[in-house]
Design a protein with these regions (language model features):
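A conserved mid-domain beta-alpha-beta active-site/ligand-binding segment of alpha/beta enzyme cores
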Residues: 109-175
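Flexible, glycine-/basic-rich loop-and-beta segments that form/coincide
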Residues: 178-210
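SAM cofactor-binding core of SAM-dependent methyltransferases
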Residues: 1-59
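Conserved beta-strand signature within the Rossmann-like core of class I S-adenosyl-L-methionine
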Residues: 94-108
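Residues at the starts of beta-strands that form the adenosine-phosphate
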Residues: 22-23, 70, 96
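Short amphipathic alpha-helix with an adjacent loop that forms part of the alpha/beta core around
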Residues: 55-67, 88
Length: 219
């Protein structure tokens, strides 16, 4: 399965939607990855910059402050990279977010004994509070994070994704509540049920099938 190519979030955002986004703005702090994104998505605006930087906040304010621009932000950090202050900045504008919360990694860092001062500071920035210190397990940490998001977006739907490699993460869909029916929120709820019903071994079989290693899925 080493040669299997799987689309990441930027490519999915560009290739999958029937109705294309008006604009794609991508932040990637690693230069080699930013350059690769430019090659794969020549029409996207790729910025080789840390999303927690003042540059991101200035860009977001300039582009979104008027309130006439609706956006979907897909927040796909590595570990504890995304700071709560950055999310808070996005919540202040008119838009929806999908946030990848890496539950296993977060709990491993937060529940670790004898943390360094740098590790504690990273956790403080990630949660935006010291309340994480009172959390004794993985579920409590996730609940804290989820409740902080719900203070800014009434419609917040966590989707648990279980990996075949013995870890899991959550895709948190956080959207504004509007006066309309928001039929697509029901679609997200239905999708949540389907994704959470998938067993880790099913995912492994899917990967093998895509890579040509298995003829059919186990039932």
């Amino acid at each position: 399965m080493n040669n299997l190519i799987v689309f990441g979030s930027p490519l999915i955002a560009d290739r999958v939607p029937r109705k294309k986004f008006d604009e794609l703005i991508l932040f990637e702090k690693k230069e080699k990855y930013a350059e690769r994104l430019r090659q794969l998505l020549p029409n996207a605006k790729v910025r080789n910059e840390d999303v927690n930087s003042p540059g991101f906040k200035a860009m977001a304010k300039a582009r979104l402050e008027a309130g006439s621009v609706h956006f979907l932000a897909f927040v796909d950090p590595e570990g504890l990279e995304i700071e709560w202050e950055t999310l808070q900045h996005l919540f202040d504008f008119t838009g929806d977010l999908i946030i990848n919360y890496q539950s296993t990694g977060v709990s491993r860092s937060a529940l670790k004994e004898n943390k360094t001062s740098a590790e504690i500071e990273t956790l403080q920035r990630f949660f935006g509070t010291d309340e994480w210190k009172a959390c004794g397990n993985e579920d409590a940490l996730f609940k804290l994070y989820l409740e902080k998001i719900r203070k800014h977006r009434e419609v917040t739907i966590p989707i648990k994704v279980r990996s075949p490699y013995r870890f899991h993460y959550y895709m948190i869909v956080a959207v504004r509540k509007t006066r309309g029916s928001q039929r697509w929120v029901s679609v997200i709820e239905e999708t949540k049920e389907k994704i959470e019903a998938i067993k880790p071994e099913d995912l492994e079989n899917i990967i093998r099938r895509l890579s040509g290693g298995q003829v059919k899925l186990a039932v």
